[in-house]
UniProtKB/Swiss-Prot annotation:
This is Ribosome maturation factor RimP. The keyword Transferase does not apply. GO terms for cellular component: cytosol. Keywords: Cytoplasm, Ribosome biogenesis. GO terms for biological process: ribosomal small subunit assembly; translation. InterPro entries: Ribosome_maturation_RimP, RimP_C, RimP_C_sf, RimP_N, RimP_N_sf. Belongs to the RimP family. Pfam families: DUF150_C (PF17384), RimP_N (PF02576). Required for maturation of 30S ribosomal subunits.
Amino acid sequence: MGGLWSMVLPVLSDQKNPNRSPLMSDIAQKVEALAIQAAKTEDCEVVEVIYRREGGVYVVRVAADKLPDDQGQERHISLDECGSISRQISSLLDVHDVIPNAYHLEVSSPGIERPLIKDGDFTRFAGKLVEIRTYQPMDTESGPRKKFRGTLLGLQEAMVVVAEANGEVRIPWEQVAKAHLTFDF
């Protein structure tokens, strides 16, 4: 396996990447389980786990964020919480010996353009500006396209619904290749 390869684990969903290596998938799932355990101690959730080889070095990237408060208000992870989660994951990985090679562990926030991965993300972030890319071009009034940007209306009957300037677009869930929050600056 030469060159750059990566394994992105859509947390709690295995349906989006059927071509991944069984060994990589197994390692990423074990890392995910340990990361979830560590994140819970800081009242956080794991957004995404990426296991990648970069220039001969294995890298584990965990994006974590605070869970909403009791009133449903969004909160954001702090640098101290990222550090705590990183130390816990590192200890858990050492104890469970999940990764057979030397690796670098990085724990961070998902960033301002947080990826939307789980179906619950499409409900939780309804009303927010999103950008979505599809696997295949979708027929629209302006012609076939793979990129959509607008206000997320939610997930309805396995369709991601987005309000664009020209109207509402319904994108089949299984066609969503990548989705993330976005902002107008």
